[in-house]
């Protein structure tokens, strides 16, 4: 069992340095979809961060638990802590890297909340002034992108929005932010 120190300064040194992608991990699950490990730029034993197939803004990424968990309340305490600590670290690095001034973190938990992939995930969007005319428009845009993603992703078809290479290049750039 993973022993997380939520109030401590560190989690475990094994988590801190497990950022480098393991060559033994051939893929990650995102609901029913397999994610190419080249799209993943940060991972802990319980969570991973990946670039987005259809980003709303530059650096719009997702943080997910490694275990396929459909709803937020189904996460264990350790998974919940690790997921949010991962989101905090990823958000901080990407906000700085993209010279953003704020972050939007969002979870759509369940179909009526706009969740279309049955796997808990946190959207992280570094924000800049004027990126949306009205700040709350980002939530409508998230809902719309989730609906489009559900319609366009088909297990029997290739993803057409961004190429694997384009996503791998972005992930590689972000991965360098987390090297030990």
From Swiss-Prot:
UniProt catalytic activity: P(1),P(3)-bis(5'-adenosyl) triphosphate + H2O = AMP + ADP + 2 H(+); adenosine 5'-phosphosulfate + H2O = sulfate + AMP + 2 H(+); adenosine 5'-phosphosulfate + NH4(+) = adenosine 5'-phosphoramidate + sulfate + 2 H(+); adenosine 5'-phosphoramidate + H2O = AMP + NH4(+)
Gene: FHIT
SUPFAM superfamilies for the chain: HIT-like
Matching PROSITE patterns: HIT_1, HIT_2
Record field: transmembrane: none
GO molecular-function term, one example from the UniProt record: nucleotide binding
Protein name: Bifunctional bis(5'-adenosyl)-triphosphatase/adenylylsulfatase FHIT
Annotated EC: 3.6.1.29, 3.9.1.-, 3.6.2.1, 2.7.7.51
PANTHER family: BIS(5'-ADENOSYL)-TRIPHOSPHATASE (PTHR46243:SF1)
Cysteine-cysteine disulfides: none
Signal peptide per UniProt: none
Active-site residues (renumbered): 121 (tele-amp-histidine intermediate)
Pfam families, A to Z: HIT (PF01230)
Record keywords, A-Z: Hydrolase, Nucleotide-binding, Transferase
UniProt: substrate binding residues: 52, 108, 123
Originating species: Arabidopsis thaliana (Mouse-ear cress)
Residue ranges occupied by any HIT domain in the UniProt entry: 27-134
Tagged with keyword Hydrolase: yes
Short sequence motif Histidine triad motif: positions: 119-123
Domain of life: Eukaryota
Function of the protein: Possesses dinucleoside triphosphate hydrolase activity. Cleaves P(1)-P(3)-bis(5'-adenosyl) triphosphate (Ap3A) to yield AMP and ADP. Exhibits adenylylsulfatase activity, hydrolyzing adenosine 5'-phosphosulfate to yield AMP and sulfate. Exhibits adenosine 5'-monophosphoramidase activity, hydrolyzing purine nucleotide phosphoramidates with a single phosphate group such as adenosine 5'monophosphoramidate (AMP-NH2) to yield AMP and NH2.
């Amino acid at each position: 069992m993973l022993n997380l120190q939520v109030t401590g300064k560190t989690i475990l040194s094994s988590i801190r340095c497990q950022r480098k992608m393991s060559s033994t991990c051939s893929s990650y699950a995102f609901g029913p979809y397999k994610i190419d490990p080249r799209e993943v730029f940060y991972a802990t034993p319980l969570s991973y961060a990946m670039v987005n197939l259809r980003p709303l803004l530059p650096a719009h990424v997702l943080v997910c638990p490694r275990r396929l968990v459909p709803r937020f309340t189904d996460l264990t305490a350790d998974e919940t802590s690790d997921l949010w600590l991962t989101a905090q670290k990823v958000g901080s690095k990407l906000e700085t890297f993209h010279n953003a001034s704020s972050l939007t973190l969002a979870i759509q938990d369940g179909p009526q909340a706009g969740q279309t992939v049955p796997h808990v995930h946190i959207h992280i969007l570094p924000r800049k002034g004027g990126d949306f005319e009205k700040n709350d428009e980002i939530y409508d845009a998230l809902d719309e992108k989730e609906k489009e993603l559900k319609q366009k992703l088909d297990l029997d078809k290739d993803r057409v929005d961004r190429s694997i290479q384009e996503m791998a290049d972005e992930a590689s750039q972000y991965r360098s932010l987390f090297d030990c």
